[in-house]
Amino acid sequence: MTPTRNLIKRAPGMPEADVFEMTWEFFGELCRVLAVKVATAGYRPDLVVGIAKAGVIPGAVVASILRCDFYSLKISRDLGAERVRARPKIFSAAPKEAMGKNVLIVDEICTSGETLRLAQNALRQVKPADLRTATSLVKQGGYKPDFYALETDATVIFPWDRQVVNDAGEIVTNPLYEGL
Protein backbone atom coordinates (compact mmCIF):
# COMPACT_ATOMS: atom_id res chain seq x y z
CA MET A 1 0.00 0.00 0.00
CA THR A 2 1.17 3.49 -0.71
CA PRO A 3 0.80 6.37 1.72
CA THR A 4 -1.05 8.45 -0.86
CA ARG A 5 -4.39 7.65 0.74
CA ASN A 6 -3.96 10.31 3.38
CA LEU A 7 -7.62 11.17 3.75
CA ILE A 8 -9.16 7.97 5.08
CA LYS A 9 -12.71 8.75 6.11
CA ARG A 10 -13.69 5.27 7.28
CA ALA A 11 -12.18 1.84 7.23
CA PRO A 12 -13.69 -0.47 4.62
CA GLY A 13 -16.63 -2.16 6.30
CA MET A 14 -16.30 0.04 9.37
CA PRO A 15 -19.66 0.88 10.94
CA GLU A 16 -20.64 4.49 11.67
CA ALA A 17 -20.75 3.50 15.34
CA ASP A 18 -20.71 0.29 17.38
CA VAL A 19 -17.51 -1.80 17.35
CA PHE A 20 -14.59 -1.85 14.94
CA GLU A 21 -11.98 -4.62 15.24
CA MET A 22 -8.85 -3.14 13.68
CA THR A 23 -6.43 -5.42 11.84
CA TRP A 24 -2.65 -5.04 11.96
CA GLU A 25 -2.71 -4.20 8.26
CA PHE A 26 -5.19 -1.38 8.75
CA PHE A 27 -3.23 -0.14 11.77
CA GLY A 28 -0.13 0.07 9.56
CA GLU A 29 -2.08 2.08 7.00
CA LEU A 30 -3.22 4.50 9.71
CA CYS A 31 0.41 5.01 10.77
CA ARG A 32 1.43 5.71 7.17
CA VAL A 33 -1.47 8.15 6.77
CA LEU A 34 -0.52 9.90 10.00
CA ALA A 35 3.14 10.23 8.97
CA VAL A 36 2.15 11.59 5.55
CA LYS A 37 -0.18 14.16 7.12
CA VAL A 38 2.63 15.36 9.40
CA ALA A 39 5.11 15.55 6.50
CA THR A 40 2.74 17.23 4.03
CA ALA A 41 1.87 19.84 6.66
CA GLY A 42 5.55 20.75 6.60
CA TYR A 43 6.19 19.68 10.18
CA ARG A 44 9.57 18.04 10.71
CA PRO A 45 9.82 16.54 14.18
CA ASP A 46 13.28 15.82 15.55
CA LEU A 47 11.75 13.23 17.83
CA VAL A 48 8.49 11.45 18.50
CA VAL A 49 7.24 10.81 22.03
CA GLY A 50 4.79 7.92 22.25
CA ILE A 51 2.41 7.88 25.20
CA ALA A 52 2.85 4.56 26.97
CA LYS A 53 1.52 2.17 26.82
CA ALA A 54 -0.64 1.93 23.68
CA GLY A 55 0.66 5.14 22.09
CA VAL A 56 4.18 3.74 21.87
CA ILE A 57 3.00 1.37 19.15
CA PRO A 58 1.89 3.99 16.59
CA GLY A 59 4.55 6.37 17.94
CA ALA A 60 7.41 4.01 17.14
CA VAL A 61 6.00 3.27 13.68
CA VAL A 62 5.47 6.96 12.86
CA ALA A 63 8.98 7.81 14.14
CA SER A 64 10.42 5.11 11.90
CA ILE A 65 8.52 6.38 8.85
CA LEU A 66 9.54 9.98 9.56
CA ARG A 67 13.13 8.86 10.29
CA CYS A 68 13.44 10.50 13.66
CA ASP A 69 14.26 9.46 17.22
CA PHE A 70 11.66 7.87 19.48
CA TYR A 71 11.05 8.18 23.22
CA SER A 72 8.15 7.30 25.48
CA LEU A 73 6.26 8.98 28.29
CA LYS A 74 4.12 6.79 30.56
CA ILE A 75 0.68 8.22 31.27
CA SER A 76 -2.13 5.97 32.42
CA ARG A 77 -5.57 5.71 33.99
CA ASP A 78 -4.93 2.04 34.79
CA LEU A 79 -5.00 1.00 38.44
CA GLY A 80 -4.76 -2.72 37.65
CA ALA A 81 -7.34 -5.46 38.12
CA GLU A 82 -9.68 -3.83 35.60
CA ARG A 83 -9.93 -0.61 37.64
CA VAL A 84 -9.23 2.83 36.24
CA ARG A 85 -8.73 6.26 37.77
CA ALA A 86 -10.93 9.17 36.68
CA ARG A 87 -8.01 11.22 35.39
CA PRO A 88 -4.77 10.16 33.71
CA LYS A 89 -1.54 10.35 35.71
CA ILE A 90 2.11 10.69 34.59
CA PHE A 91 4.40 7.86 35.69
CA SER A 92 7.68 8.87 34.02
CA ALA A 93 9.67 11.99 33.30
CA ALA A 94 9.48 13.71 29.95
CA PRO A 95 12.59 12.90 27.89
CA LYS A 96 15.22 15.61 28.40
CA GLU A 97 16.28 15.01 24.78
CA ALA A 98 13.22 17.07 23.76
CA MET A 99 14.92 20.29 24.88
CA GLY A 100 15.20 22.68 21.94
CA LYS A 101 13.73 20.12 19.51
CA ASN A 102 10.59 19.83 17.40
CA VAL A 103 8.53 17.17 19.17
CA LEU A 104 5.56 15.14 17.97
CA ILE A 105 3.52 13.49 20.75
CA VAL A 106 1.70 10.36 19.52
CA ASP A 107 -1.10 8.34 21.12
CA GLU A 108 -3.35 5.64 19.69
CA ILE A 109 -6.68 7.44 20.23
CA CYS A 110 -7.98 10.76 21.50
CA THR A 111 -11.34 11.23 23.17
CA SER A 112 -11.22 14.03 25.74
CA GLY A 113 -7.67 15.23 25.10
CA GLU A 114 -6.74 14.90 28.79
CA THR A 115 -3.83 12.55 28.14
CA LEU A 116 -2.45 14.65 25.29
CA ARG A 117 -2.69 17.86 27.33
CA LEU A 118 -0.94 16.17 30.27
CA ALA A 119 1.84 15.03 27.93
CA GLN A 120 2.14 18.53 26.44
CA ASN A 121 2.44 20.07 29.91
CA ALA A 122 5.11 17.54 30.91
CA LEU A 123 7.11 18.12 27.74
CA ARG A 124 6.87 21.92 28.00
CA GLN A 125 8.90 21.59 31.22
CA VAL A 126 11.95 20.51 29.16
CA LYS A 127 11.47 23.44 26.74
CA PRO A 128 11.10 21.95 23.25
CA ALA A 129 11.39 24.31 20.27
CA ASP A 130 7.94 23.20 19.07
CA LEU A 131 5.35 20.69 20.25
CA ARG A 132 2.56 19.06 18.21
CA THR A 133 0.15 16.19 18.86
CA ALA A 134 -0.98 13.27 16.71
CA THR A 135 -3.21 10.23 17.14
CA SER A 136 -4.17 7.30 14.97
CA LEU A 137 -7.83 7.81 15.81
CA VAL A 138 -9.96 10.60 17.22
CA LYS A 139 -13.47 10.26 18.61
CA GLN A 140 -16.05 12.36 16.77
CA GLY A 141 -16.98 15.50 18.67
CA GLY A 142 -13.99 15.23 20.99
CA TYR A 143 -10.70 17.08 21.36
CA LYS A 144 -8.75 17.28 18.09
CA PRO A 145 -4.97 16.80 18.07
CA ASP A 146 -2.87 18.65 15.49
CA PHE A 147 -2.82 15.51 13.31
CA TYR A 148 -4.98 12.39 13.18
CA ALA A 149 -5.55 9.65 10.65
CA LEU A 150 -9.19 8.71 11.22
CA GLU A 151 -12.25 10.02 13.05
CA THR A 152 -14.79 7.53 14.40
CA ASP A 153 -17.67 7.00 16.83
CA ALA A 154 -16.99 3.26 17.06
CA THR A 155 -15.57 1.40 20.01
CA VAL A 156 -12.21 0.34 18.59
CA ILE A 157 -10.55 -2.95 19.41
CA PHE A 158 -6.88 -2.54 18.57
CA PRO A 159 -5.01 -5.60 17.30
CA TRP A 160 -2.68 -5.62 20.33
CA ASP A 161 -5.65 -5.59 22.75
CA ARG A 162 -7.83 -8.24 21.11
CA GLN A 163 -6.25 -11.19 22.92
CA VAL A 164 -4.44 -11.58 26.24
CA VAL A 165 -2.73 -14.35 28.19
CA ASN A 166 -4.83 -15.75 31.04
CA ASP A 167 -3.57 -17.19 34.35
CA ALA A 168 -3.19 -20.63 32.72
CA GLY A 169 -0.86 -19.19 30.09
CA GLU A 170 -3.41 -19.47 27.29
CA ILE A 171 -4.19 -16.85 24.67
CA VAL A 172 -7.84 -15.86 25.12
CA THR A 173 -10.18 -13.06 24.07
CA ASN A 174 -9.59 -10.00 26.23
CA PRO A 175 -12.33 -10.06 28.91
CA LEU A 176 -12.93 -6.35 28.23
CA TYR A 177 -14.25 -7.28 24.78
CA GLU A 178 -16.33 -10.35 25.59
CA GLY A 179 -19.87 -9.80 24.42
CA LEU A 180 -19.03 -7.03 21.96
Where are these regions (language model features)?
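Short, glycine/charge-rich flexible loops or terminal/linker lids adjacent to PRPP-binding catalytic cores
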Residues: 64-103, 114-121
